[in-house]
Amino acid sequence: MTDDFAPDGQLAKAIPGFKPREPQRQMAVAVTQAIEKGQPLVVEAGTGTGKTYAYLAPALRAKKKVIISTGSKALQDQLYSRDLPTVSKALKYTGNVALLKGRSNYLCLERLEQQALAGGDLPVQILSDVILLRSWSNQTVDGDISTCVSVAEDSQAWPLVTSTNDNCLGSDCPMYKDCFVVKARKKAMDADVVVVNHHLFLADMVVKESGFGELIPEADVMIFDEAHQLPDIASQYFGQSLSSRQLLDLAKDITCLLYTSPSPRDTR
């Protein structure tokens, strides 16, 4: 594995401007050993170490089912669109790779059609965006809304044309066979390397615990980039919180009960 990071290694040969760094090489060795032994590994690498390549190369060399989780969707897109293809090409990797996000990141064809039919009832700007999205829906391969450049990210049309767990029709949907979410999940199930984000990974844990299926396939190797973000994100899925508003409401309820309930003397 360390040969990939040598001055005459595969990465240096295939990537213009690649310069071997000893910390990067050491990290790659540690990742390789952890994968081979099936042991956990925590790595803290300084800025400029090149940690992405240091875990990607061993992961691809392992020829196992790999899940890579990033701290944000922006990093997820960068890893999938730039870093992973670069290292894959350098190592002549022939496995299948997939990108998987939560359902709200994909265009829902059924909801898009419903909004188009209700066009006359929509505000002008939203209707204009829906029309643009109908055109884009015929061009996009994966329905990933982050790749749509014709409609602004903050457009009020997006919530109307993406789905949630509550409004998704599932297999009863007339557009089910063309569903971008279903296609993305199937591709992930069949892929050798799947790139997800921490939010989706933890949401998958919740789904699996409920016994209602899974969002992410099982894997031999799990890699968490920006793993220090996991505790805070995990608390959103598995923690319990109490807001000041809830405490105030509780205090009001208790006060109301104290003033409206009969005293023990009155109940004799």
Could you tell me what each predicted segment is?
Residues 218-232:
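SF2 helicase catalytic motif II
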Residues 37-55:
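Walker A/P-loop
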Residues 205-207, 231-238:
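Conserved ATPase-coupling elements of RecA-like P-loop NTPase cores
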Residues 53-64, 85:
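Walker A/P-loop NTP-binding motif
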Residues 2-42:
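Conserved pre-motif I regulatory segment
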Residues 185, 201-216:
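Conserved helix/coil segment N-terminal to the catalytic DExD/H
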